Amino acid sequence: MPNSFRTAVIGLGSMGYGVAQSCLRGGHVTYGFDVVPSQIERLQSEGSMKGDLADIAGTLDAAVIVVLDAAQTEDVLFGKRGLVPLMRKGAVVLACATVPPNFARTMEARCSALGIHYLDAPISGGSAKAASGQLSIMASGTPDAFAAAAPVLDATAETVFELGDAAGAGSAMKAVNQLLAGVHIATMAEAMTLGMTQGVSPEKFVEVISQCAGTSWMLENRAPHIVAGDYAPLSQVNIWPKDLGIVLDIAKSASFSAPITAAALQQYLVAAGMGLGREDDAAVAKVYARNVGLTLPGAA
């Protein structure tokens, strides 16, 4: 890849910032944009370029959209200051948010009408893997979209799953992943706090269950947050009402019953209602603790 490959990352949260760092490390001429100016300045201190998005849009080879949801994605691409109409023909958009499959198909069609490739490219792996260029990307799009996006995929991903030649398949797979991930976090919290009622300490829970058949990646990643009493958000509680809501919308459209997903969603909604929405999603354990009068580590 020539060092002149030009990439903009829009959305410099915990995942997007890591994606931008990986693009920098991969030799891209990298721009970063966010609603929080300090995030832009921080990335610039690491080597990203300065510039207004509207001014540099026509020079980009790729735009990586790492925002919260479908509404923010659409606003970035086609809103009042929409990016896509300003991009040069043949450039590519990689859309990384968790969105409904039909939304991804619509964005692909709108981008294609303006000569822009669209890769449905939801990401997984957490902020550490984003920063180290080791994400898993569940991607779908035309062969030309994959080809145009290759330098970004090479810089940011350890594994790229090529799931089809049209947008939507990537987002469908991400929804399935989020079903499992959201349920696993909630059931980890349920199991840990049930154990506490029987005298099993959170520390011993993590030590033992992480080595047993009941473990999961989410248990091993999130349960230590509870043990440490550290709810600084790597992934917020507020993510899950949105993501599990997408899962249930897909299920409804398929006349598919998803009762376990629905039960997990309720726990996240209760957590958000308790004012925990901006805390790490491991804070769903506080719902269970409150219900039975338990004191979690680090609680006052």
Identify the meaning behind each predicted range.
Residues 53-117:
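Rossmann-fold NAD(P) dinucleotide-binding segment
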Residues 133, 137-140, 161, 167-198, ...:
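Active-site-proximal catalytic alpha-helix in oxidoreductases
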Residues 1-66, 91:
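NAD(P)+-binding Rossmann beta1-loop-alpha1 motif at the extreme N-terminus of oxidoreductases
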Residues 30, 50, 117-119, 160, ...:
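Hydrophobic beta-strand scaffold residues
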Residues 171, 180, 215-279, 300:
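Interdomain hinge/lid region at the active-site interface
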Residues 7, 98-178, 182:
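Rossmann-fold dinucleotide-binding core
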Residues 11, 203-211, 262-266:
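Beta-strand segments within the central parallel beta-sheet cores of soluble alpha/beta enzyme folds
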